[in-house]
UniProtKB/Swiss-Prot annotation:
Name of the protein in question: Ubiquitin-associated protein 2
Function: Recruits the ubiquitination machinery to RNA polymerase II for polyubiquitination, removal and degradation, when the transcription-coupled nucleotide excision repair (TC-NER) machinery fails to resolve DNA damage. May promote the degradation of ANXA2.
Organism: Homo sapiens
Biased composition annotated in UniProt, kind: Low complexity: 389-407, 435-447, 663-678, 695-736, 874-900, 1002-1011, 1088-1102
Annotated gene: UBAP2
SUPFAM superfamilies (alphabetical): UBA-like (SSF46934)
Record PTM Omega-N-methylarginine, positions in chain: R166
């Protein structure tokens, strides 16, 4: 069937080619030829192939011992002559030439690659015959077989300018797709067969198909490769044919197609192709990363153009804007930048690094991410920024790539002044070779030229000035403002000073980074592939590290700039993330500015304005720097000691910078500001935590942020596009909780730009900088409260935010956000429908959890009706209370189990929001309580301890304060955190539970006041548990969510940012008021009372009263 079908298709295809050929330049003539050839081939391949061809193949396999593919190809080449095929197989390519004779003219076209063509034709025949044989033997289907031929023919056609010749060749090879005929059967030049993308897409299913295209493209040489490239619309057009081939291979998933059948043959052929195309192909294959390294390294003068091209290419792959702008910067040597072009060139390495590292790292963080991530992490961990200056060169030498190493080596000497080298190093991370060369040349050309971009140069200067000394800061400001070169000198001193300390650290981690490229190189195993491998390896390694350490990658640059070890770490890492955003968002930002923001806390804001400076480069940047540096100088004067207090200084700086930034409020400035401000805000909070702690938490933050930043940078870019509107930036950031700090910065920036509100709230934000993010989430509507709220949020952010906040949109959202909205919906149903009754899963969960605790408790929840009525009736609650009290004691002991009571249903509901309480019930039951309960208690407590405690700073934010405060936070806008915290056991339940009363029964326990607690017991179990639990249902989902995500605590905290549930987030702003009132009634009261339990009774009343109607009722959720 397949054979006949295939043949039919082929014939149909032949007919089509005639039509399409008629349409195409060389119509029927070629079509007729191709048709005849194809007819013969089709008969041989299809009609005969099923029996004859396959028998022949078997015979060949037996006689020659070759594999089936080789035999098929040989038969194909020999037109079914078994003896001839045996000779070919045994003797080698003897008949390949004769077979090519069909495509002799093609040879003429590609005599250069005649051998390659032979191999290619042979291969394509192999593959095409494979396709045919597969069609016949494997039943792949005629279409695929034809596609193979078409591809082969198409390739041949591409190579063979003469369609007739190509058609002949195609006929010789097999029924030509009409490709040989020019347009070929498919009038559109290969309905995809012609285009590499179409090739791999349509024929990707056929291993051979894409391979044919790729290999043939490489083999075909300039003619075919160029045609394919042009058709493909790949960068390959601009590059050599082999480069285009490399692109095709890289873009076309050639690796997959190289995998099995074709690999051996293709490998040798690849070697052949590699020899001729190694340098050029490497340009494209690496995904442009290799292009930068290999090409740029090889031709230093050419590297400038190559840089533009390679960067542009990488732009195509990765973040176009960042790379493009970087190209402009790099090209600033040749292109814009004028006064600052040299400075930009010296800075451009930085901006390139940051842009490439951040934007490029984010988008295509192959090398950059690898290098910068490890390097930056090392540097971040090695607090002193100066280390990075020298270290980057060393680290990035090994880290960026073996090839890059040379550039790196060059760069350290290149650092004519530490600033230049510093910039070089910064630029090193990703485009190190090119940047190193460019920066070297440029720096050599304009060591002092760095001065021209006061913003950019000043930024490095600032970073370095910071490194230099607090004492220098006044002069540093002057220097920065006056001459970056002067600051460069100072910087060179200061930078070199820290370098000795930290170089070793960076070097230590360099090998891993270098290992990654090495392994990546190893991946393909072929010369061409090696270049490609570097790209892939870098991409793969870079992708993960760059995501986790993506902020870090810029951070290395940042850390270079930042002299203070703790400060540099915490600052650089968050800033790095923001830098990523900025660089990605603002390619024109020169991310040098962004780097500046990274290097300096206020500098981050500063850099935001320098980013804006790109437009109003000198003025805004100078102003930003001037006011900025004054604070920076003061804060920097005590770099080590003020570190923690530096946040305060930073907030001032931030205030200054946003103010200054406001004027240059360019789109880049905005995006830069959000990220930088957020970094600034974030870092202070981190610095508050502790330099060392922050560095690891920051690493986590940067990891989560980095991943978030990816989206953030995209959104940030939107924000930038949005222009200076802080609200829009915030919305982009806030939607991207991932922009946690970024969002915080956004909100902060907004308020900063707004004016005083930032100054007061920014101080809070600096301490609460992370908190700013949740604030940001809700901050676009109101920043002041969110910023204030951020006080608690920041701790949540470090722990919870990275996983939950960002993940919800980035990683978590797939499961989390949908779950939240759905879960919120379920919660709405739960609240509205009294889930206990509607969803037995929750009652089951509760009884299960309660069952382990107390059967009577289970009764309370089970008699959801009674309990509900109990809500209404204190009498019902009284009995409920009695069980509740046992539950209380048990819930105290088992309040984790109690949490399952809340969570178990919720987790199922949460995780199986659709199924939740029915199907999810059992799993919620077992899965929820077990999985969720321990996570709830452990993670949530952990969250409360780590996150709630810092955020709440209430002793053992464990359950009591943590939960109460969690609600406070929730009210304040850390919705998810609040939910997760307070919601942990249940709104009132959580506080009570934290009080140790009992998760839900804690309310009853809390007062044990029969009347109220009874109500609480019943209400809590039902109204509370269900209403609250509904509310908590929100919280448990964070926990369930965390459990699901595996980062329960953080996730719950992460929820705090308000992402956890959009509903929560929604509720947060809207709910922030009504729900805040309710929650604040019980939660704040709990928090105020300081004892979740005792306060809870009174708060519970309002909660029972207000919450029942408002909170317990759907209205809460509705809100």
């Amino acid at each position: 069937m397949m054979t006949s079908v295939s043949s039919d298709h082929c014939r149909g295809a032949r007919e089509k080619p005639q039509i399409s050929a008629a349409q195409s330049t060389q119509p029927q003539k070629q079509v007729v030829q191709a048709t005849a050839e194809q007819m013969r081939l089709a008969q041989v391949i299809f009609d005969k192939n099923d029996s004859d061809f396959e028998a022949k193949v078997k015979q060949l396999m037996e006689v020659t011992g070759k594999n089936q593919d080789e035999c098929i190809v040989a038969l194909h080449d020999c037109n079914g002559d078994v003896n001839k095929a045996i000779n070919i197989l045994l003797e080698g390519n003897s008949d390949t030439t004769s077979w090519e004779t069909v495509g002799c003219k093609k040879k003429n076209f590609a005599k250069e690659n005649s051998e390659n063509k032979e191999n290619r034709e042979k291969k394509s025949e192999k593959e095409s015959s494979r396709g045919r044989g597969n069609n016949n033997r494997k039943g792949r289907g005629g279409n695929r077989g034809r596609e193979f031929r078409g591809e082969e023919n198409g390739i041949d056609c591409n190579q063979v300018d003469k369609p007739s010749d190509r058609g002949k060749r195609a006929r010789g090879r097999g029924f030509g797709r009409g490709r040989g005929r020019g347009a070929g059967r498919f009038s559109t030049q290969g309905m995809g067969t012609f285009n590499p993308a179409d090739y791999s897409d349509s024929t990707s299913t056929d291993v051979c198909g894409t391979k044919l295209v790729v290999w043939e493209a490489a083999q075909n040489g300039a003619d075919e490769g160029t045609e394919l490239a042009s058709n493909t619309h790949n960068i390959a057009q601009d590059l050599s044919n082999k480069s285009s081939y490399g692109l095709k291979g890289a873009w076309k998933n050639s690796v997959e197609e190289w995998t099995t059948e074709d690999w051996t043959e293709d490998l040798s052929e690849t070697k052949v192709f590699t020899a001729s195309s190694a340098p050029a192909e490497n340009h494209i294959l690496p995904g442009q990363s290799i292009d930068l390294v290999a090409l740029l390294q090889k031709p230093v003068p050419h590297s400038q153009a190559s840089e533009a091209n390679s960067f542009e290419t990488s732009q195509q792959q990765g973040f176009g804007q960042a790379l493009v702008f970087t190209n402009s910067q790099h090209n600033n040597q040749m292109a814009p930048g004028t006064g600052s072009s040299t400075a930009v060139n010296s800075c451009s390495p930085q901006s390139l690094s940051s842009v490439l590292g951040s934007g490029f790292g984010e988008l295509a963080p192959p090398k950059m991410a690898n290098i910068t991530s490890s390097q930056i992490l090392d540097q971040l961990k090695a607090p002193s920024l100066g280390q990075f200056t020298t270290t980057p060169s060393t680290q990035q030498n090994s880290t960026s790539h073996p090839t890059t190493t040379t550039s790196w080596d060059l760069k350290p000497p290149t650092s004519q002044s530490s600033v230049l080298s510093h910039l070089d190093f910064k630029s090193q991370p990703e485009p190190s070779p090119v940047l190193s060369q460019l920066s070297q040349r440029q720096q050599h050309q304009s060591q002092a030229v760095t001065v021209p971009p006061p913003g950019l140069e000043s930024f490095p200067s600032q970073a370095k000035l910071r490194e230099s000394t607090p004492g220098d800061s006044p002069s540093t400001v002057n220097k920065l403002l006056q001459l970056p070169s002067t600051t460069i000198e100072n910087i060179s001193v200061s930078v070199h000073q820290p370098q000795p300390k930290h170089i070793k650290l960076a070097k230590r981690r360099i090998p891993p980074a270098s290992k990654i490229p090495a392994s990546a190189v190893e991946m393909p195993g072929s010369a061409d592939v090696t270049g490609l491998n570097v790209q892939f390896g870098a991409l793969e390694f870079g992708s993960e590290p760059s995501l986790s350490e993506f902020g870090s990658a810029p951070s290395s640059e940042n850390s270079n700039q930042i002299p203070i070890s703790l400060y540099s770490k915490s600052l650089s890492e968050p800033l790095n993330t923001s830098l990523s955003m900025t660089s990605a968002v603002q390619n024109s930002t020169y991310t040098t500015s962004v780097i500046t923001s990274c290097s300096l806390t206020s500098s981050s804001l500063n850099s935001a304005s320098p980013v804006a400076m790109s437009s109003s480069y000198d003025q805004s940047s100078v102003h930003n720097r001037i006011p900025y540096q004054s604070p920076v100088s003061s804060s920097e004067s005590a770099p080590g000691t003020i570190m923690n207090g530096h946040g305060g200084g930073r907030s001032q700086q931030t205030l200054d910078t946003p103010k200054t930034t406001g004027p240059p409020s360019a789109l880049p400035s905005v995006s830069s500001l959000p990220s930088t401000t957020s970094c600034t805000a974030l870092l202070p909070s981190t610095s508050q935590h502790t330099g060392d702690l922050t560095s690891s938490p920051l690493s986590q933050l940067s990891s989560s942020l980095s991943s978030h930043q990816s989206s953030l940078s995209a959104h940030a870019a939107l924000s930038s596009s949005t222009s200076h509107t802080h609200a829009s930036v915030e919305s982009a950031s806030s939607h991207q909780s991932s922009a946690t700090f970024s969002t915080a910065a956004t909100s902060v920036s907004s308020s900063a730009s707004s004016g005083a509100s930032l100054s007061s709230s920014m101080n809070t934000a600096n301490s609460l900088c992370l908190g700013g993010t949740p604030a940001s989430a809700s901050s676009s509507s109101s920043r002041a409260a969110p910023l204030v709220t951020s006080g608690k949020a920041p701790p949540n952010l470090p722990q919870g935010v990275p996983p939950l906040l960002h993940n919800q949109y980035l990683v978590g959202p797939g499961g989390l956000l949908p779950a939240y909205p759905i879960y919120g919906y379920d919660e709405l149903q739960m609240l509205q429908s009294r889930l206990p009754v509607d969803y037995y899963g929750i009652p089951f969960a509760a009884p299960t959890a309660l069952a382990s605790r107390d059967g009577s408790l289970a009764n309370n929840p089970y008699p959801g009706d009674v309990t509900k009525f109990g809500r209404g009736d204190s009498a019902s609650p009284a009995p409920a209370t009695t069980p509740a009290q046992p539950q209380q004691s048990q819930s105290q002991t088992h309040h984790t189990a109690q949490q399952p009571f809340v969570n178990p249903a919720l987790p199922p509901g949460y995780s199986y929001t659709g199924l939740p309480y029915y199907t999810g019930m059992p799993s919620a039951f077992q899965y929820g309580p077990t999985m969720f309960v321990p996570p709830a208690s452990a993670k949530q407590h952990g969250v409360n301890l780590s996150t709630p405690t810092p955020p709440f700073q209430q002793a053992s934010g464990y359950g009591q304060h943590g939960y109460s405060t969690g609600y406070d936070d929730l009210t304040q806008g850390t919705a998810a955190g609040d939910y997760s915290k307070g919601g942990y056991a249940g709104s009132s339940q959580a506080p009570n539970k934290s009080a140790g009363s009992g998760p839900g029964k804690g309310v009853s326990v809390s007062s044990s006041t029969t009347g109220l607690p009874d109500m609480t017991g019943s209400v809590y179990n039902k109204t509370q548990t269900f209403d609250k639990q509904g509310f908590h249902a929100g919280t448990p989902p964070p926990f369930s969510l965390p459990s699901v995500l595996g980062s329960t605590g953080p996730l719950a905290s992460g929820a705090a940012p308000g992402y956890a549930p959009p509903p929560f987030l929604h509720i947060l702003p809207a709910h922030q008021q009504p729900h805040s009132q309710l929650l604040h009634h019980h939660l704040p009261q709990d928090a105020q009372s300081g004892s979740g339990q005792r306060s809870q009774p009174s708060s519970l009343q309002p909660k029972s009263q207000a919450s029942k109607p408002a909170y317990g009722n759907s209205p809460y959720w509705t809100n």
